Amino acid sequence: MYIFVSRPRKCTLFFVIGHLKDEGGDIMTKEVLSAIQDAVGTQVFGIWFLIGAAFVFFMQAGFAMVEAGFTRAKNAGNIIMKNLMDFCIGTCVFIPLGFGILLGEDALGGFIGTPTLGIFTDYANFDWSNFVFNLVFCATTATIVSGAMAERTKFLSYCIYSAVISAVVYPIEAHWIWGGGWLASLGFHDFAGSCAIHMVGGTTAFIGAALEGARIGKFTRDKDGKVTKVHAFPGHNIVIGALGCFILWFGWYGFNGAAATTGPQLASIFMATTIAPAIATVVCMIFTWLRYGKPDVSMCLNASLAGLVAITAPCDVVDATGAIIIGVVAGLLVVFGVWFCDNVAHVDDPVGAVAVHCLNGIWGTIAVGLFATKTAPECTLKGLFYGGGFHQLGLQLLGVVTVMAWTIITMTIVFKIIDKTVGLRVTEEEEIVGLDVKEHGLASAYAGFSLMDIIEGSMSINENTELGENDYDEASEAQRAASVKVTAPVDPETGIHKVVIIAKLSRYEKLKTALNDLGVTGMTVTQVMGCGVQKGAGEKYRGVEMDVTVLPKVKVEVIVGSIPVDKVIETVKRTLYTGHVGDGKIFVYNVQKVVKVRTGEEDYDALKDVE
């Protein structure tokens, strides 16, 4: 058997199968076979290492889709631009600074790596694979932040702090963990980044969202500034959000598995990366179903990501039982995190980045010290629940505390400096109009579609709207001011009427059939959005009761002349009635004149469609 392997570090492997014998004609020794297998294994996993990096790069698309889908349409272009630029800007600063700090020679007692320009001065011996691999991980840390600070952050400010994260903040703490720094020397374990990437990104997201404040209309406050109500801002396209979730889950097999060194270890990592998010999603579905009355779609998408984040650090050291327990906790923790941000911390996080990445990054890191088992391939650790005592758990807690402290201190300083110089947040007008228009000159990310953004979509009951008096003379002054006393039709009767019907979309087909059976031969149909005073419990979005936001309705307009208008009204009422709020309304108008454009016929003659 002849084997030709390309130059060292190259990811090309060429085999020619034949018969290999030594000079004496004997079959090759076991030692030679073992050496060949090792060489082949090294090359195969070297190739997989780079394929995994490509998987992680593709996760940028997943983050972009999740963030765009979970926010409003007027900011979709801005979200896409941020997710593109944080990678591109991160690459620019990672070349001269970030890579050396992360994997350079230890300095300051393992606190930081020594920056190097080897990519320019010694390219032939440069560690190309590790550069690409660590670059895509670095970009993930920066992109996590954009979701929590979406819809109100200046694009320039985003570019600045993304550069700082990629150049300094992430490389230093990642050096502690993966670059041979002080945490690594102690035995801290974070295989793929629950702590180094997700907790850091989620913590930065929380700090940034808290410092710049909530989106306009997210919280209602009293005169003392106390939050009295939380408003739900549903994402404009849950389908795009779901696509992003699936892209991320797919990419996570590379995220977690790329650094595997043996086939069994890779298989075990894939298993854990499948079990934990699946369990987390099912647990979240059941919990939201019980808690809110219906399974929450967006929360379940977040739960899938939460399970993936939580399994990232321990994916190589846990068995199936550990992965299941980690997933169960992640599914509950993400719901708690979203509720906590909205109702306790009053931090506006549009996509749930804090709950998904920060809280579950912490949980996944701690889980190593609880569920690590030597039955996992290549694992040498034992967690608390597998007879390992508190040693590894203590190391994991130390890592969480120190990395979080580093992140809080550095990013608070960075955000404060940005806010005092170029400004962190856009103006009120820019936020209301949308960042697509104001920041990028993009009229709409969906060309040809009109975008409507209504912050407060409900009508409230007050002294002017509760008009229950039968006699106008007995009404209060406020009620009189809000009402119009009608004694006679404004327009003279012509015998021709316009009937406008607002109804539920679900009743349209029955309404059309009933009107057709009545003799109505033509109608104008428009899909509209409507709202009104809503009494009773409303729907929930991510655990927050929604104001009666504008709901889809159908508006049907018909012109009747020979058909008695009372008969039309009775037919419509009978067809639309269900006994529930929102059955619809009927408006009747006098029509002064009808003109058929083609023939010039008027009134009744113009209404005849049959020649």
Can you annotate each of these PLM segments?
Residues 1-27:
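Short, Lys/Arg-enriched N-terminal segments with co-localized hydrophobic residues
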Residues 3-5, 26, 78, 421, ...:
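General helical secondary-structure elements
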Residues 6-8, 17-20, 219, 487-489, ...:
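Compositionally biased, intrinsically disordered low-complexity segments
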Residues 10-12, 85, 510:
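Sequence-pattern detector for short linear motifs
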Residues 14-17, 67, 89, 205, ...:
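Enrichment for repetitive, rod-forming helical segments
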Residues 15-17, 22, 35, 469, ...:
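Generic detector of low-complexity/intrinsically disordered segments
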Residues 29-487:
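Glycine- and aromatic-enriched membrane alpha-helices
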Residues 438-444, 457-611:
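Positively charged, small/polar-rich N-terminal and surface patches that mediate targeting and assembly
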